[in-house]
Design a protein with these regions (language model features):
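Extracellular polysaccharide-recognition and catalytic grooves
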Residues: 1-191
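Extended polysaccharide-engagement surfaces of secreted carbohydrate-active enzymes
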Residues: 110-320
Length: 320
């Protein structure tokens, strides 16, 4: 902004920061959140990057702007598939109280001139994710979005969050900056590939080799599922969220928002082992091995006892 207004800026420092941001890009539309993958790729990198490129970068730093826009284009073929057939978002990763901020990059596909974007599907996802929360009375408390997902939910809140953090939700309304006759606003809402391409009785996997992320779509129930990265010990998790349910589940499903694990073995979407202390300990130290023939393989080891090892093979099924 300052350079655009004619002020002198530290060029080398500015460019070094741009290079650091782009160095976080791993492929297929995903930036790494150091060390995990989560929605920061979408509501931060894939939101700020295209906006910066469009408003400033294309004129002042075209080579960097081009990279941000190419990275945005890579996202088209997988990120929208993370949402359910009805357009609901998945409860996955940190800062989930930002909720429908996950839709921020969808309207910014307006900057994508490839002709490969289904703008009606993008807006369908955005409007449905808004309704996913606005139609629930527990979403608001004293007129302010609660700290949680559908309602207040402490296990999903991080140490850096406060009551004002929820206003990141407002990023969803960046779409209002687009003109009324834009592709995003003029297209008719639709369900994209859920309408005809994703057939019932089948399961559809989108594996991304650059990140080892697996997005699975289930036409029978209309749900979508994410398998992602987690390899963080509780002992060294100074941030107190990298090793938790926000990341350590075997998978995250749009139809089954995760629940907090209980001390008496109440565990969802994970395996629990009673450790030497007599405590139920879930898996969190996963190592990706392969994805072949529809089988997603990981090894896992118990944090408190490295002799306890698992070889995991996930086979997504139409009703499983």
């Amino acid at each position: 902004f300052l350079k655009d207004q004619g002020y002198a800026v530290n060029e080398s420092y500015l460019e070094s920061n741009l290079q650091k941001l782009l160095a976080r890009y791993r492929g297929e539309g995903w930036y790494n959140d150091a060390p995990a993958y989560d929605y920061y790729s979408a509501w931060a990198y894939q939101t700020y990057g295209p906006i910066w490129a469009e408003m400033f970068g294309k004129k002042q730093y075209p080579q960097y702007a081009r990279q941000f826009m190419e990275n945005q284009h890579d996202m088209v073929d997988n990120y929208p598939f993370l949402f359910s057939r009805d357009g609901r978002m998945n409860m996955w990763g940190r800062s989930i109280c930002y909720r429908f901020a996950v839709t921020a990059p969808l309207s910014l596909y307006e900057y994508d001139k490839s002709g490969n974007v289904n703008y009606g599907w993008m807006r369908r996802i955005a409007s449905s994710t808004l309704l996913q929360f606005l139609e629930r009375p527990e979403f608001l408390e004293d007129g302010v979005p609660t700290m949680g997902f559908y309602g207040p939910f402490a296990p999903a809140v991080q140490i850096y969050s406060c009551r004002g953090s929820v206003y990141w939700c407002g990023k969803a309304f960046l779409s209002l900056l687009l003109p009324e006759n834009s592709n995003y606003w003029s297209a008719t809402e639709n369900n994209g590939p859920w309408e005809k391409e994703l057939e019932k009785g089948k399961v559809y996997n989108k594996f991304q080799p650059a990140t080892n992320l697996l997005i699975t779509n289930y036409p029978n129930c209309g749900g979508s599922e994410m398998r992602s990265w987690c390899h963080e010990t509780v002992a060294k998790d100074w941030q107190k969220f990298r090793s938790t349910e926000n990341y350590n589940k075997l998978a995250y499903h749009t139809e089954f928002p995760w629940m907090a694990d209980g001390k008496n073995g109440e565990i969802s979407m994970n395996y629990g082992t009673k450790n030497k202390k007599g405590e139920w300990e879930v898996l969190r130290l996963y190592t990706f091995k392969s994805f072949e023939n529809g089988i997603y393989r990981r090894d896992a080891v118990l944090e408190t006892d490295s002799c306890v090892k698992y070889q995991l093979a996930d086979i997504p099924l139409p009703d499983g």
